[in-house]
């Protein structure tokens, strides 16, 4: 079994997301809000973890509790997706409504080719199935 890196994350009051390590070594994020404080915390955490991803990583974002995403959230996600270190990442995003889905689609459309591979889903099962597909190495 591969060794799991410890997750350098601790819950803080007022931060509207949690993250756990997936069995495949990726991360499972659950957002309850997308406030500026939450976004700032997530951005810092996400960038910290980009740099230690030396192999393909599968991340899951559960955004079903969010009713919409702000422009700020979209910009930060794009910034993370466009980082050269993000090319090794496959991200499944589970959304609960059309508004959030459209925002995530916008992020996917604006992400440069060769960046993060993104999939958008309405249920966890489809997201997991997609994440589990064999990884294609993008050059």
Where do the language-model regions lie?
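Amphipathic, Lys/Arg-enriched alpha-helical "gate/interface" segment within cytosolic domains
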Residues: 2-139
């Amino acid at each position: 079994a591969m060794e799991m890196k410890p997750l350098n994350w601790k819950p803080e009051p007022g931060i509207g997301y949690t993250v756990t390590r997936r069995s495949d070594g990726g991360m499972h994020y659950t957002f309850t809000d997308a406030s500026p404080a939450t976004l700032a915390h997530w951005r810092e955490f996400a960038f910290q973890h980009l740099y230690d991803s030396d192999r393909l990583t599968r991340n899951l974002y559960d955004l079903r509790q969010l009713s919409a995403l702000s422009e700020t959230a979209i910009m930060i996600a794009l910034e993370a997706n466009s980082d050269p270190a993000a090319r090794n990442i496959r991200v499944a995003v589970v959304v609960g409504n059309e508004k959030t889905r459209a925002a995530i689609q916008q992020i996917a459309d604006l992400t440069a080719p060769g960046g993060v591979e993104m999939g958008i889903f309405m249920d966890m099962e489809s997201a997991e199935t997609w994440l589990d597909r064999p990884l294609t190495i993008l050059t």
